Regions:
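Catalytic machinery of carbohydrate-active enzymes
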Residues: 1-329
Length: 329
């Protein structure tokens, strides 16, 4: 009888993408299994035509949040999963996991409901060399092995055809924005970098609808005439499909970095206030983290970043050598 698995990750886009490494691993060991995933409503498009997922459960956190969660919980109970894997540390999804009527449940010890999980793993952040995919993989080691796989998203053939028009000449992608100020390389510094990019390279600025203004300012203030802003114009999977074949992708410590990892696309990730040891860095074979070489007592200042630099100087961004970005071209 085929196994039934549910993976729960209802946090940000980047976290959801990283959780797909579990999908990859479970499928590699249990290719005939049913794998479902519970995510935040609005991110379903990431999994259009996904070859390994049976069903995506989308939790609406904005409208009747807990009423909808209760409905999801009842649905989950009716599935009789063999294993529910919860990679989050929050009570709401911990409840669904603990009382989801599964034969086995796995999650981290920091989840308030972990006392009811059948498999509880210590959650560690800041351990050198321990990536989020390694942390998450520990939840399924007992039915797979200790080696995590890279996250994977699967743009359809039609999506690749739709973005083909942007690939007629050699190009790079730049995703200049982040939800957090201290995780975002400043606009002036992106402009400084783009002014050093050779004119024969097409530059595509990527981002969501909220990033349109920033991308337009960067495009208009940079010297290059070969810069095109696609902010707000591409879906997440279309962006991933474009990033896959780029000469290089320049990103912050944010979701576009994880999109690039999902395609094993060449990546240069600029880390400002955060550090790679948190375990959320790029995973592509050709990927590097660019950061300040100076010693700053205030860095890292937090796991997720802040709306402004707590010290007021933002040296972790302004002290980065722009040539390290240029040298990756």
């Amino acid at each position: 009888m085929k196994k039934k698995f549910l993976i729960i990750q209802t946090a940000s886009i980047g976290d959801v993408i990283l959780a797909t490494a579990i999908v990859e691993k479970l499928h590699s060991y249990h290719p005939d299994s049913q794998i479902d995933m519970m995510i935040k409503k609005g991110y379903e498009g990431l999994f259009d035509c996904h070859p390994y997922l049976n069903k995506v459960i989308a939790w609406d956190k904005k409208n009747n949040k807990y009423k909808h969660l209760f409905e999801i919980w009842r649905s989950v109970r009716s599935e009789h999963y063999d294993l529910i894997v919860n990679v989050q540390r929050y009570a709401a999804t911990g409840f669904v996991t603990a009382f989801g009527n599964a034969k086995e449940t796995a999650g981290f010890d920091k989840n308030p409901f972990s006392i009811f999980f059948t498999r509880k793993i210590r959650h560690q952040i800041g351990v050198p060399g321990l990536h989020e995919v390694n942390r998450n993989n520990k939840l399924i080691e007992h039915i797979t092995d200790e080696v995590p796989m890279r996250p994977g998203l699967y743009p359809s053939e039609q999506i690749f055809e739709d973005v083909k028009c942007y690939k007629s000449e050699e190009y790079i992608c730049v995703a200049p924005c982040s939800l957090w100020f201290t995780k975002q390389f400043p606009e002036a510094r992106w402009i400084e970098f783009l002014n050093l990019v050779q004119d024969n390279l097409k530059v595509y600025l990527l981002g969501g609808k909220d990033d349109v203004d920033v991308c337009e300012r960067i495009k208009n203030q940079a010297f290059g005439k070969n810069i095109v802003s696609l902010a707000g114009k591409l879906s997440l999977l279309e962006s991933a499909a474009l990033m896959r074949d780029a000469r290089m992708n320049y990103v912050n410590d944010s979701s576009p970095m994880h999109l690039a990892s999902s395609q094993n696309a060449k990546t240069t990730a600029v880390f400002c206030s955060t550090v790679n040891d948190f375990g959320f860095g790029p995973l592509s074979e050709d990927s590097v983290v660019v950061e300040t070489r100076g010693k700053l007592d205030c860095r890292p200042c937090g796991l997720h970043g802040y709306k402004k630099c707590p010290k007021g100087h933002f040296k972790c961004a302004y002290d980065i050598d722009i040539n390290e970005l240029v040298n990756r071209l």
